[in-house]
């Protein structure tokens, strides 16, 4: 056993000796062929900018170094200190020459320029120009350069919202059709006053008369007044109100309509003031919230005022006829009975027809019947009741609307006497 192990160990040692011999021969051959003394490299040499590691040349690449030799630049360059010191790069800039001009220099320059100018004798010898002859222009023939100062600027009228909408012919018919469908939705109940335990029709008439005065005091649009009364009737159709809170309902409704329609609506403090401080701001705001909740925030409703203005534009009526139809439309606001049972478009058609009859015009032109989709037979009943209201207007307890339309702004149409009878053909 010991011999076997000993012989094995001897063989291993001989193999190692043989390998060492081969390595010595290879090293000697490399040294002899390359004639390069390979320095013994220490584990961690001194790292400086001067010591550049150059790989030893191999026997296979002992020839001239070509462009693909990775050490060719290492042999040529050194990134250490250079013999040439770093010098700053300078750019030469010429200093600007400032020329100081004096009075003498300017005079000399001008004299030299004048001396250089020499006029040709042929130019100076030209005859002088003769004066142009006066040309007579006949202004009566309408010269394009003559302004007609006799034309006076027409009085500029404020542009209202309805006029802008109806001025678009592509959409006017669709808008009218849509509003005719919308007026049937969310209507107030005609007989709601019978279910109110503490208020009556006369109290409502007083409230409407007061709201007409408020709208005139604050110069609110007519549409604002019609919207506010629409909110009141719809609210009272669903809610019972005590007489002490009826004016609060009217003030809050006017406040909502003003914020919807007006550009600069009155502040809530103004509506407290017009009630003679009967209510506080907190109460007006709470009632506003309650009304909007009951109405489901549906405040965009087509009114009698909108349809009346639309029919007047369709018929191309004059200002007197339009003002009279507006006056008749507002008279229907005071009395809930019987006008709540009619659609706003029906009342508007009847008011314009009655205005035409009063002023001696054609009651309902065929062109208007075609555009409005209304015939006289469809609103004849409303026309009869409106005629009775027109006759009884001077004797009505509430006179705010009549006083309003006595103004020259509305051509004093409330002073026009109603016709003796309704004479028209259906």
UniProtKB/Swiss-Prot annotation:
SMART domains reported in the protein's UniProt record: CYCLIN (SM00385), Cyclin_C (SM01332)
Record's keyword annotation contains GTP-binding: no
Alphabetized Pfam families for the sequence: Cyclin_C, Cyclin_N, Cyclin_N2
Composition bias, Polar residues: 1-11
Residue ranges crossing the lipid bilayer per the database entry: none
A single GO BP: mitotic cell cycle phase transition
Function as written in the Swiss-Prot or TrEMBL entry: Essential for the control of the cell cycle at the G2/M (mitosis) transition. Interacts with the CDC2 and CDK2 protein kinases to form MPF. G2/M cyclins accumulate steadily during G2 and are abruptly destroyed at mitosis.
Protein name: G2/mitotic-specific cyclin-A
Organism: Patella vulgata (Common limpet)
Organism phylogeny: Eukaryota, Metazoa, Spiralia, Lophotrochozoa, Mollusca
């Amino acid at each position: 056993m010991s011999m076997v192990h000993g012989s094995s160990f001897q063989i291993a040692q001989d193999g190692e000796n043989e390998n060492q011999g081969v390595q010595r021969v290879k090293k000697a051959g490399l040294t002899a062929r390359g004639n390069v003394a390979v320095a013994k490299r220490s584990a961690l040499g001194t790292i400086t900018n001067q010591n550049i590691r150059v790989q030893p040349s191999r026997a296979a690449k002992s020839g001239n170094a070509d462009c693909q030799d990775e050490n060719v630049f290492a042999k040529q360059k050194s990134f250490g200190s250079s013999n040439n010191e770093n010098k700053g790069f300078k750019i030469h800039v010429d200093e600007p020459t400032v020329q100081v001009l004096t009075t003498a220099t300017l005079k000399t320059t001008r004299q030299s320029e004048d001396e250089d100018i020499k006029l040709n004798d042929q130019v100076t010898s030209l005859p002088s120009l003769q004066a142009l002859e006066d040309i007579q222009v006949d202004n009566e023939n309408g010269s394009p350069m003559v302004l007609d100062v006799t034309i006076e600027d027409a009085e500029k009228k404020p542009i209202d919202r309805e006029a802008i909408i109806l001025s678009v012919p592509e959409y006017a018919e669709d808008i009218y059709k849509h509003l005719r469908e919308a007026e049937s939705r969310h209507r107030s109940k005609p007989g709601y006053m019978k279910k109110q335990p503490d208020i009556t029709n006369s109290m409502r008439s007083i409230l409407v008369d007061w709201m007409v005065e408020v709208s005139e005091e604050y110069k609110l649009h007519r549409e604002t007044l019609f919207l506010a009364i629409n909110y009141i009737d719809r609210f009272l159709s669903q809610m019972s109100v005590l007489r002490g809170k009826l004016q609060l309902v009217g003030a809050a409704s006017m406040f909502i309509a003003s914020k919807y329609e007006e550009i600069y609506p009155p502040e809530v403090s103004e509506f407290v003031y017009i009630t003679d401080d009967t209510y506080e701001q907190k109460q007006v705001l709470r009632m506003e919230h309650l009304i909007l909740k009951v109405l489901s925030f549906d405040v965009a409703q087509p009114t009698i005022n909108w349809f009346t203005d639309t029919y007047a534009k369709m018929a191309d009526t004059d200002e007197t006829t339009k003002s009279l139809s507006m006056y008749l439309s507002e008279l229907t606001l005071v009395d809930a009975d019987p006008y709540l049972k009619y659609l706003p478009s029906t009342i508007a058609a009847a008011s314009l027809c009655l205005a035409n009859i009063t002023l001696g015009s054609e009651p309902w032109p065929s062109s208007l019947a075609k555009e409005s989709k209304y015939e006289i037979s469809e609103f004849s009943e409303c026309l009869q009741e409106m005629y009775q209201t027109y006759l009884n207007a001077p004797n009505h307890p509430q006179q705010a609307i009549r006083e309003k339309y006595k103004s020259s702004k509305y051509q004093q149409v409330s002073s026009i006497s109603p016709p003796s009878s309704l004479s028209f053909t259906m």
